Design a protein with these regions (language model features):
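N-terminal maturation segment of proteins
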Residues: 3-221
């Protein structure tokens, strides 16, 4: 029969494989924006990347996400914590706390509040885009592709807000006014918009101070 030490090694190896798989699956499913801020070189970590995407924000996705979290928790619970190494036990506890926190929202998906005056998506997304670093030409191409998806993504947010309103969970008039006010700064002429200015600055930094004409060529090569 396998020794106790051998059994622990087997459990620890299985846990490492589980953690690695969950890490890759989560990041492979992440939006291009999220992935860019987490990992510099996804391929070197074994993370598969598809076409650039802002992701989706739909009620069905929230429900599916909770179902997936429940499935991952069930897999996590199969491990004997006492057989794990100390660092694995720390990761186990962290994962369990994260999953438990996520599952507190199960059945309450329509209470999700993606829009709010100061920390809503409409306030955070432009800032994240403005701080999106250009480390290679693909980053620039992905960034431009993300900009093309903004209308579609905001359309999904609007549809979700209509679903909330139909369920009696819509924003108050004051909340809507505050959110609208928070968007006014993004409605200035494009040539004066901070996203345009930051794009030009990042492009110049990436190209080593080349002229605007040379930068235009960089994008069309």
């Amino acid at each position: 029969a396998p020794s106790a030490a051998s059994q622990k090694e087997t459990v620890q190896a299985a846990f490492d494989e589980f953690a690695d798989r969950i890490f890759k699956e989560e990041l492979s499913a992440a939006s291009t924006l999220d992935l860019h801020y987490i990992v510099t070189d996804p391929e070197s970590c074994g993370i598969e990347t598809g076409p650039p995407t802002l992701g989706t924000f739909r009620l069905t996705n929230l429900i599916q996400g909770n179902a997936e979290a429940k499935a991952v928790k069930a897999q996590l619970e199969e491990f004997d914590v006492s057989s794990l190494a100390f660092d694995q036990q720390v990761l186990y506890d962290t994962l369990m706390e994260t999953l438990d926190a996520a599952l507190m929202a199960e059945g309450l998906e329509l209470y999700e509040q993606p829009l709010s005056p100061t920390i809503g998506v409409q306030a955070q997304l432009p800032i994240l885009l403005a701080e999106y670093e250009f480390n290679c030409k693909a980053d620039i191409e992905n960034y431009l592709a993300l900009l093309e998806q903004l209308d579609q993504y905001y359309g999904q947010l609007l549809e979700f807000e209509f679903q909330k309103a139909d369920a009696g969970l819509g924003l108050s008039d004051e909340g809507i006014d505050a959110i609208a006010s928070s968007c006014e700064g993004y409605l200035i002429p494009p040539e004066e918009n901070f996203l345009t200015e930051s794009f030009d600055a990042r492009l110049e930094t990436f190209s080593g101070g080349q002229s605007a004409k040379d930068n235009a060529g960089l994008l069309t090569d």
